[in-house]
Amino acid sequence: MNTIISKRFFSENVAELVIDAPLIAKSRKAGHFVIVRVDKHGERMPLTIADADVEKGTITLVVQRIGVSSNKLCALEAGDELADLVGPLGKATDIKKFGTVVCACGGVGAAPMLPIAKALKEAGNRVITVLAARNADLIILKEQLEAVSDEVMVMTDDGSMGQKGLVTTGVEQVIAREQVDKCITIGPAIMMKFVALTTKKYNVPTEASLNTIMVDGTGMCGACRVTVNGKTKFVCVDGPEFDAHAVDFDEMLSRLRQYKNEEVESMSLGGQEFSSLGVTSEQVQSTLNSKASKPSVTPLVPPFAGTAKDRVAIPRVKMNELKPEERIQSLYAEVNQGLTFEQAVTEAHRCLNCKKPTCVEGCPVNINIPGFIKQLEIGNILGAAQIIGESSTLPAVCGRVCPQEKQCEAQCIHLKMGKEAVAIGYLERFVADNAELKVESQSSKVGKKVAVVGSGPAGLAFAGDMAKYGYDVTVFEALHEIGGVLKYGIPEFRLPNRIVDKEIEGLRALGVTFQKDVIVGKTLSIEDLQAEGYQAVFVASGAGLPRFMGIPGENLNAVMSCNEYLTRVNLMNAASE
């Protein structure tokens, strides 16, 4: 999968890649795009699908070498594999019989225009393609466009091929001689802006296919937003095609320029990865572990000999934290360092083992909280883990990020006595971090397949529960990392990726399988899953699009949604540059 089948250059800086991607080839339509990631350090780069061969299971992409990522992609050869390829994305082009349609494209915009022109022609339209570039060397796909158009008009800035002039000159010539019912434009943003201004003078409905900055490309971060008719729209899910007369091109152009200096600097360094200011979370954790005294798992300890009053008198444990002077050295060092064995046992002594434990009622998954704490109190960490594992699939995650103060701990009897609640979250984390527990299925295999859409906390928890009941579970994830919001939405100083990965490996041990770069509803449909034998589908697609307030300035450069900021830092490693 994702193997480059063939590669050729149209010009010095424009390459065509044919890639093995059978699922995308099968589901792709004119106007769709994909997100490409060259390697584990690469950006997520949007590229419109220029062509697809369903029988061969391939898609065709045309790439112009502009920045670091596009240079990396163009440097690959046939036989190389892309780290990630996800799609099809965006809305397909609205194809129907309009009448006469002008397809105005510039530069590499000819590639995404090709399937659109072909589909329009097949729908019975008269298709006139205006193909523009600076010079003859940059004109691409002319013969292919001629095969699907009634007429191809070539425009070059220097007159080296076709007519001398801009794309707008050709568009106006067509409008002047005959009725034009629709115009579609694809190319550089500045070109599309002036095509829109030209067609607006003649009241010709015009669609522009926008290519904005993207981070995830699946509708989660909001980096691709544009203003259309005064409202914020997202290119990756609402587009990429919009009413060109309603697009705020000036704002879009400004947003496209915001990382120009950084890109130039990266190119001047030959695309080297910046590492002088950051280290990996694994390196940080390794350093911290070498400094800290890890809690030892000792044999069973004698039971607490005091009274209930003595238990209540024990003060709540304070979490050990990384020192500020160490904390400021990296975004990835976990601040809360966990409890020592002695601290955990002492805190467990505070539990009164209530006959009617309201803390269990406050827990969303009804963990037997007094039960696991009593095991921990006598030093039986494995026994405590087994009790937690009966109800919770992700104890190391939940012990860190669950809002215990609003759930289980909020129901603790200590609060009614004017004391601080038992630190249930701290204890759950301690058990999860220190017990090497192999979770096993509670049932024999039932021979039924279940699909889970999304690998965030809901998807992972559901997958674990179904696997325990004997179902064959597959989790489909749109991004290139398993974990969803646990990976991209929570900073590593609070929830390290290694903890999430450990929980995921536990699910794999249960038999759960994972497929990345698959968008259910795009790459695969529910009907496709049913045809493959899945008898149930659990949709855990996450929070979705960010919400903007519609106030002046929120689309200015360097204004980000929290989703975009966290995704850039957590998923794309932006903090290392």
Regions found by a protein language model. Give the residues of each.
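FNR/FR-type flavoprotein reductase catalytic core
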Residues: 68-215
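Ferredoxin-reductase
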Residues: 1-80
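Rossmann-like dinucleotide/flavin-binding elements
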Residues: 113, 119, 356, 452-476, ...
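Glycine-rich FAD pyrophosphate-binding loop
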Residues: 471-487
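Residue-level detector of alpha-helix initiation sites
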Residues: 107-110, 189-190, 220, 393, ...
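N-terminal Rossmann-like dinucleotide/flavin-binding domain of flavoprotein oxidoreductases
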Residues: 385-395, 427, 486-534
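A short, basic/flexible loop-to-alpha-helix module at the beginning of a structural domain
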Residues: 86-97, 432-450, 567-577
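Ferredoxin-type iron-sulfur electron-transfer modules and their immediate structural context
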Residues: 240, 248-284, 288-442, 449, ...
